Amino acid sequence: MFYTHVLMSKRGPLAKIWLAAHWEKKLTKAHVFECNLEITIEKILSPKVKIALRTSGHLLLGVVRIYNRKAKYLLADCSEAFLKMKMTFCPGLVDLPKENFEASYNAITLPEEFHDFDTQNMNAIDVSEHFTQNQSRPEEITLRENFDNDLIFQAESFGEESEILRRHSFFDDNILLNSSGPLIEHSSGSLTGERSLFYDSGDGFGDEGAAGEMIDNLLQDDQNILLEDMHLNREISLPSEPPNSLAVEPDNSECICVPENEKMNETILLSTEEEGFTLDPIDISDIAEKRKGKKRRLLIDPIKELSSKVIHKQLTSFADTLMVLELAPPTQRLMMWKKRGGVHTLLSTAAQDLIHAELKMLFTKCFLSSGFKLGRKMIQKESVREEVGNQNIVETSMMQEPNYQQELSKPQTWKDVIGGSQHSSHEDTNKNINSEQDIVEMVSLAAEESSLMNDLFAQEIEYSPVELESLSNEENIETERWNGRILQMLNRLRESNKMGMQSFSLMKLCRNSDRKQAAAKFYSFLVLKKQLAIELSQSAPYADIIATMGPMFYNI
């Protein structure tokens, strides 16, 4: 089966259908609810790989079984919900008499009974007992200092020397004659008085009566060190009767005799605890309380990112680069520097001050400023005024005497608006008036321009209140503006026709005009052609456009 991977893949849409058709016992409740029958049937109808008719029948069987399972699960859920609702809302058990509609106060109110807490009585606490319960008694923490005789005579010898001394007598063998330490003579009376001190152990080795062996043990260096630790304030010496005997004289004249039935250096316990050593109560104030660590609070910035306005404000902020100009007390030189140091003065005057005043005036006249921004409406008005001003200059230059060049040196103004481009256009106009043909054309147009000036002033007076009233509606302003231009062009053509001109050249009308003015005149020609005021003709592509009178030339 080449399409086995389509049917048997675990994530495929037909896997659960194939499982339901062939192995229904393996189908779980989750498989049934996850299976979308609508998508599955679409996959069966339009499979990626062609499926045999028998296989598609098996898949439809799986669809039916899954649908049957879903119906059973839905029926079981509905039955369970119905039973729960029936058990919850029992109509026979809810009916109550009218007097029992409202519960009594005691039935819905908790009694205010305050029981005693299981805490100890603060007055019954014995503070002294509380602090002394962790203190031990002296006899529990103190080592006993009672040493037996076995410890005295067996310490640090491991039983070797005692065995030797037990077999050899001091009087028979000279074993310890070379031992270091002074030997002092002692009387026999002191010897008999001291024997009872060392023979009370009764260890059962049979040396209780051997006085010589006990004396030999006591004369060894190691045993003398132990005796010094036991605070014996006497020395032991040998009797003077034998020739090699040695005696030890006591340092003190008094002899302290210790009874045999009493142990040496035994710790004496006092009867009362007050006379003995007791620990003082512990002061709780001395114990520094463990400082509780504060839970560190996680601080998150409320502003996680910078907005575009904040970034733009930071980029355009010049507070760090500009400062307030602080000048010294004003003097004539400082004021002159302040006046001449401005941007307007530097960009509109010469860099040198040693220039004549007339030369400065000429420099100011020839200075061209660019990049001066005007509003949309003001730019169009300025273009119209420049056009009319140029034509007015041509008219005055042709009508007046030959000293017209001196008159051109003075700027011609219309409504006190002077632009740098006017002066350049004046020079271009003067250069173009060289040929006789141009002079004749300019003379013929002079009369037209004089009438157009009057019409333009009248139109601006008429349209100015309308424009002021309709500033809010920009579309109406644009329409009125173009209507004024078209009407101006039509009046100009009418004046030329009255002077005898039957055809009008667009190239001649656009002479000494910039691109924007030429486009406006061409658009005016097209609108007049649409209104049948003029007829347009062109001999060749990109050639001059010639306009002639149309049927509505004088009727618009």
From Swiss-Prot:
Gene3D superfamilies: Structural maintenance of chromosome 1. Chain E. SUPFAM superfamilies: Winged helix' DNA-binding domain. It is found in: Nucleus; Chromosome. GO terms for molecular function: chromatin binding. The keyword Cell division does not apply. Keywords: Chromosome, Chromosome partition, Meiosis, Nucleus. One of its GO terms (biological process) is sister chromatid cohesion. Its main location: nucleus. The keyword Ribonucleoprotein does not apply. It comes from the Eukaryota. GO terms for cellular component: chromosome; meiotic cohesin complex; nucleus. Belongs to the rad21 family. Component of some meiotic cohesin complex composed of the SMC1 (SMC1A or SMC1B) and SMC3 heterodimer attached via their hinge domain, RAD21L which link them, and STAG3. Meiosis-specific component of some cohesin complex required during the initial steps of prophase I in male meiosis. Probably required during early meiosis in males for separation of sister chromatids and homologous chromosomes. Replaces RAD21 in premeiotic S phase (during early stages of prophase I), while RAD21 reappears in later stages of prophase I. Involved in synaptonemal complex assembly, synapsis initiation and crossover recombination between homologous chromosomes during prophase I. This is Double-strand-break repair protein rad21-like protein 1. It comes from Homo sapiens (Human).
